[in-house]
Amino acid sequence: MKVLGLETSCDETGLAIFDSEQVTSDNKGLLGQVLYSQIELHALYGGVVPELASRDHIRKLVPLFNELLQQCNITKDEIDAVAYTKGPGLIGALMTGALFGRSLAYGLDIPAIGVHHMEGHLLAPLMGANPPAFPFVSLLVSGGHTLLIAAHGIGQYEILGESIDDAAGECFDKAAKMLGLPYPGGPNIAKLAESGNSDAYSLPRPMLHRGLDFSFSGMKTAVHNLIKDTPCSGGSGNGSDSDPQVRADIAASFQHAVVDTLVKKCVKALKQVNMSRLVIAGGVSANSHLRKTLERELAKINATVHYAPPALCTDNGAMIAYAGYERLQAGQADDLAVSCVPRWPMTELPAV
């Protein structure tokens, strides 16, 4: 079965084709994928502008679809089903992909299914070279979400913890903006932190010893105050008198605080549910400091960590195609009505 996946939940336009008959140890059925990022568009504003995101998806969907067909060397008539991101995300952006996908499926007389964006991230590591077996704990960490989930099977999800305010990725972006770094903040903070001392400044770890929920708003405030009160930080009010080492130390200290919080919660979650496999997915999962720290700390408790392939860490169509395939195989499909859900708890998903 060839499934076209469409991802338009935020600022990436991602399309991919998953072919269940081409699953090998090398590509796990990914026939091809194309991805267009709107980073340059939104960098001018320091963050994603929803209306601009929607309009850009509209401009890019058809050209990217044609490019994907050419890359895979197939025609549209060879597509067997369509999977599109139904939510959560920016409602206008979601609607562009949903309407394109549902219309294409109707025209080709093939089934279509709306996919949960975060389930796509959760299942993306199953497309890797060393896919984890259920059950496992999953840390879904991105610009819009920070979730700890006990996954017992596809659609069998138990929320162990989540952010009660800002997501970890959002905190990265805002801290980067305070330091005068360009959007997106996560990769730029990580790059700057490489030359910094993570022990230079002490930052709080909110709710570290209070269950499995997360809170990053206090950390964001602490970074703001640190930058404001530190000479030569290059941040708000200090831009003309900046010291590269001071800025690198702040970035490294901030990154270490976020990573320390995430890792300790993951270890606690694994112990709480008596599992030994951790899956980490979402844009922040690409952070090398997070990966190294997780591998070191999980080795101490005889647990393993699994990631999505590098190209599938950020938003992409491949994860949507694969998640859609799994649900289509279980006999699930949507009717002609198109609906998108900006907020959608994963616990509401049906089991496969």
UniProtKB/Swiss-Prot annotation:
GO molecular function, one term: N(6)-L-threonylcarbamoyladenine synthase activity
Binding site for substrate: 140-144, 173, 186, 287
Protein keywords: Acyltransferase, Cytoplasm, Iron, Metal-binding, Transferase, tRNA processing
Cofactor dependence: Fe(2+)
Superkingdom of the organism of origin: Bacteria
Gene3D superfamilies: 3.30.420.40
EC number assigned by the record: 2.3.1.234
SUPFAM superfamilies: Actin-like ATPase domain
PROSITE patterns listed in its UniProt record: GLYCOPROTEASE
Swiss-Prot/TrEMBL GO biological process terms: tRNA threonylcarbamoyladenosine modification
Protein's cellular compartments: Cytoplasm
Pfam family, one: TsaD
CDD domains (UniProt xref): ASKHA_NBD_TsaD_bac
Cofactor note: Binds 1 Fe(2+) ion per subunit.
Keyword Acetylation: no
Residues given in the record as Fe cation binding sites: 117, 121, 315
Catalytic activity: L-threonylcarbamoyladenylate + adenosine(37) in tRNA = N(6)-L-threonylcarbamoyladenosine(37) in tRNA + AMP + H(+)
InterPro entries named among the record's database cross-references: ATPase_NBD, Gcp-like_dom, KAE1/TsaD, Peptidase_M22_CS, TsaD
Task performed by this protein: Required for the formation of a threonylcarbamoyl group on adenosine at position 37 (t(6)A37) in tRNAs that read codons beginning with adenine. Is involved in the transfer of the threonylcarbamoyl moiety of threonylcarbamoyl-AMP (TC-AMP) to the N6 group of A37, together with TsaE and TsaB. TsaD likely plays a direct catalytic role in this reaction.
HAMAP family membership: TsaD
Family to which this protein belongs: Belongs to the KAE1 / TsaD family.
Name of protein: tRNA N6-adenosine threonylcarbamoyltransferase
Species assigned in the record: Psychrobacter cryohalolentis (strain ATCC BAA-1226 / DSM 17306 / VKM B-2378 / K5)
